[in-house]
C-alpha cells in the first residue's frame, strides 16, 4: 500500500523541499514553505501507472480544416474585446489578476451580463461570495435582469459536474467565470485550498474542461505584494492568456493590460473609468491623461507612446530644484529610476547640463506607468525645461530613444504616434532623425533630432527669444 510522503512546497514559486526551512532556496522568500502530503512507495510510481493504463493512438490532423463553432465570443465591450484580441476564443483559458478591490469582479460581472444579452450562456461561479452578494453587485451595476447563471462552490469536481450536466436541457456554457482560482480545491490533491498543489491541480482540471468542451474559461487570480499573480508560476504557462487589471488608489481609471495572449497581440491595454454605476469604457485614453494640463508651466512634456497597437499621449512632469543635501535626491513615479539616471548622465556628459547640486523629481501624470525607451527624449526635454525655467511649446509631442553617446535613435510606430497627436490638436513634434520621410504633405511640423544636444540648444534658444 502506498504511504504518504511529506514534502514542503514554496507558496511563492512552487519549489519542492524535502524538509522545512525558513527561507526558500529558489526564490529567497521567507516563511513560504507549507507542508503537503504526496503518495509514495510501492504502487505509486510511474511504473505502476503504466501497468494500469496503456496509451491509445490519437488521430493526427492538418492545420487546415473546418471550424465548427465561431472562433471568438464578442462581448460588445470594446475595451475588453481589444485586450482579448477581438473576443474570448472558444476553448481557451484566461487568467485575470489584480489588486484586491481594483474591480476584477465588477468587470467580469459586466462582461457576463453583456455576453448573456447577446444570447450566450454564461456561468459565474464564485468561491469568495455568496449568490446574494453577487446579486447585490449586479443590482448596483444595473445588470440584474441579465440571464447569467450563478453558483457559489469551491469543489472543482462539483463545478464541472454542474456545468456539464444537461438536466435542464440547455446548451453547454459559452463562458465560465471562476472567481477565484485560489479558493478552489480538488479531490485529486490532499493539501489545503490555496496551496500550490491545489491551485495547480484545479487550474489543470478547468483548462482540461475548456479544451474538451470548447467553452471559454476565465480564472480570477489573487496577486502578491509584488504585484505578481499568487500561486505557482506554471499556471501562467498553462493558460492561453494572462491579463492584469491595474490602477492607482487615488485615481478613478483602471487599465486592463495583456501580458500573454496566444490568440492576439500582447501589451494591449483597455482603459476603464470607475464610477458609481461600475466601469465605463474610455475610448480615447489620451484625452483622459491630458485632461488637466498647465501649458505655461516649465518641466512638462507630452510623450507620444504606444501600448500594443494603441497610441497613447501622456504628460511627463519634471521638477529640478536646488538641493541642500550632500547627495541630491532622485525620485521617480511611473518610470524606471535607472533610466532616469542614464538620461541625467548623458545630459551632463554630452550637453553640459549639470544636475549635481539639484534634486530631480519625475512624475508621469495620471498615475500612468511607462516602460518603453521611446520616452527618453520627452524626459530629457522636461528636465531641461525645468532646469532652465522655460516652458515647452504646448502643441508639441516628443518621442525617441537616447543612446549613451547622446544620439537620438528611431523608434517603431512613428506614424501611429503622429496621427494620434494630430487628432488631438498637436501641430509639431520632436522626432528622431529620419522620421520625416514617413510623414510628408501634412500641416504638421517635424523637428528631426539627431543628437540630444540639438534638442537642448533649441530649448535654450526658445527661452532666449522670449527674453
From Swiss-Prot:
SUPFAM superfamilies: P-loop containing nucleoside triphosphate hydrolases, Ribosomal protein S5 domain 2-like
Alphabetized GO MF terms: ATP binding; ATP hydrolysis activity; ATP-dependent DNA damage sensor activity; damaged DNA binding; zinc ion binding
Binding positions for ATP per the UniProt entry: 98-105
Keyword DNA repair recorded: yes
Zn finger (C4-type) location: 10-27
EC number(s) recorded for this UniProt protein: 3.6.4.-
Region (Lon-protease-like): 359-467
Motif RadA KNRFG motif boundaries: 260-264
Pfam families: AAA_25, ChlI, Zn_ribbon_LapB
EC top class, as a word: hydrolase
Domain of life: Bacteria
Any one GO cellular component localisation term in the record: cytosol
Keywords: ATP-binding, DNA damage, DNA repair, DNA-binding, Hydrolase, Metal-binding, Nucleotide-binding, Stress response, Zinc, Zinc-finger
InterPro entries for this protein: AAA+_ATPase, DNA_repair_RadA, P-loop_NTPase, RecA_ATP-bd, Ribosomal_Su5_D2-typ_SF, Ribsml_uS5_D2-typ_fold_subgr, Rubredoxin_2
GO biological process, one term: recombinational repair
Phenotype upon gene inactivation: No alteration in UV resistance; does not replace RecA.
Protein's job: DNA-dependent ATPase involved in processing of recombination intermediates, plays a role in repairing DNA breaks. Stimulates the branch migration of RecA-mediated strand transfer reactions, allowing the 3' invading strand to extend heteroduplex DNA faster. Binds ssDNA in the presence of ADP but not other nucleotides, has ATPase activity that is stimulated by ssDNA and various branched DNA structures, but inhibited by SSB. Does not have RecA's homology-searching function.
Domain statement: Has a putative N-terminal zinc-finger, a middle region with homology to RecA with ATPase motifs including the RadA KNRFG motif, while the C-terminus is homologous to Lon protease.
PANTHER family (alphabetical): DNA REPAIR PROTEIN RADA, DNA REPAIR PROTEIN RADA-LIKE PROTEIN
Family: Belongs to the RecA family. RadA subfamily.
The protein, known as: DNA repair protein RadA
Natural source organism: Brucella abortus (strain 2308)
Amino acid at each position: 500500500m502506498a504511504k504518504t510522503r511529506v514534502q514542503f512546497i514554496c507558496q511563492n514559486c512552487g519549489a519542492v523541499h524535502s524538509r522545512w526551512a525558513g527561507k526558500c532556496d529558489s526564490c529567497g522568500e521567507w516563511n513560504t514553505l507549507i507542508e503537503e502530503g504526496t503518495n509514495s512507495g510501492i504502487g505509486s510510481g510511474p511504473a505502476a501507472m503504466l501497468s494500469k493504463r496503456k496509451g491509445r493512438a490519437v488521430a493526427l490532423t492538418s492545420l487546415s480544416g473546418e471550424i465548427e463553432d465561431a472562433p471568438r465570443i464578442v462581448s460588445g465591450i470594446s475595451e475588453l474585446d481589444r485586450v482579448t484580441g477581438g473576443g474570448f476564443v472558444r476553448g481557451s483559458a484566461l487568467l485575470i489578476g489584480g489588486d484586491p478591490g481594483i474591480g476584477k469582479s465588477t468587470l467580469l460581472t459586466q462582461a457576463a451580463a453583456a455576453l448573456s444579452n447577446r444570447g450566450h450562456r454564461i456561468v459565474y461561479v464564485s468561491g469568495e461570495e455568496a449568490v446574494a452578494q453577487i446579486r447585490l453587485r449586479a443590482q448596483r451595476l444595473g445588470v440584474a435582469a441579465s440571464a447569467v447563471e450563478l453558483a457559489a462552490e469551491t469543489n472543482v469536481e462539483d463545478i464541472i459536474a454542474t456545468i456539464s450536466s444537461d438536466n435542464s436541457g440547455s446548451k453547454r456554457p459559452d463562458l465560465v467565470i471562476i472567481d477565484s482560482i485560489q479558493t478552489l480545491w480538488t479531490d485529486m490533491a490532499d493539501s489545503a485550498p490555496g496551496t500550490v498543489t491545489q491551485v495547480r491541480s484545479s487550474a489543470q482540471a478547468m483548462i482540461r474542461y475548456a479544451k474538451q468542451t470548447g467553452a471559454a474559461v476565465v480564472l480570477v487570480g489573487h496577486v502578491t505584494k509584488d504585484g505578481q499573480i499568487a500561486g505557482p508560476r506554471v499556471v501562467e504557462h498553462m493558460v492561453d492568456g494572462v491579463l492584469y487589471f491595474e490602477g492607482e488608489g487615488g485615481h478613478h481609471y483602471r487599465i486592463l493590460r495583456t501580458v500573454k495572449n496566444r490568440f492576439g497581440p500582447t501589451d494591449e491595454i483597455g482603459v476603464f473609468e470607475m464610477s458609481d454605476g461600475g466601469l465605463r469604457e474610455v475610448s480615447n485614453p489620451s484625452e483622459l491623461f491630458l485632461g488637466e494640463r498647465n501649458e505655461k508651466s516649465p518641466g512638462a512634456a507630452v510623450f507620444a507612446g504606444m501600448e500594443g497597437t494603441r497610441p497613447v499621449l501622456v504628460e511627463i512632469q519634471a521638477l529640478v530644484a536646488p538641493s541642500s543635501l550632500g547627495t541630491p535626491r532622485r525620485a521617480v513615479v511611473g518610470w524606471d529610476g535607472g533610466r532616469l539616471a542614464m538620461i541625467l548622465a548623458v545630459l551632463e556628459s554630452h550637453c553640459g547640463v549639470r544636475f549635481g547640486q539639484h534634486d530631480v523629481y519625475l512624475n508621469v501624470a495620471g498615475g500612468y506607468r511607462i516602460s518603453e525607451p521611446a520616452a527618453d527624449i520627452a524626459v530629457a526635454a522636461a528636465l531641461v525645461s525645468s532646469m532652465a525655467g522655460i516652458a515647452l511649446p504646448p502643441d508639441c509631442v516628443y518621442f525617441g530613444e537616447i543612446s549613451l553617446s547622446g544620439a537620438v535613435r528611431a523608434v517603431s510606430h512613428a506614424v501611429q504616434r503622429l496621427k494620434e497627436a494630430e487628432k488631438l490638436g498637436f501641430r509639431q513634434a520632436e522626432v528622431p532623425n529620419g522620421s520625416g520621410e514617413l510623414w510628408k504633405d501634412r500641416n504638421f511640423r517635424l523637428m528631426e533630432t539627431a543628437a540630444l544636444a540639438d534638442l537642448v540648444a533649441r530649448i535654450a534658444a526658445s527661452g532666449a527669444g522670449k527674453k
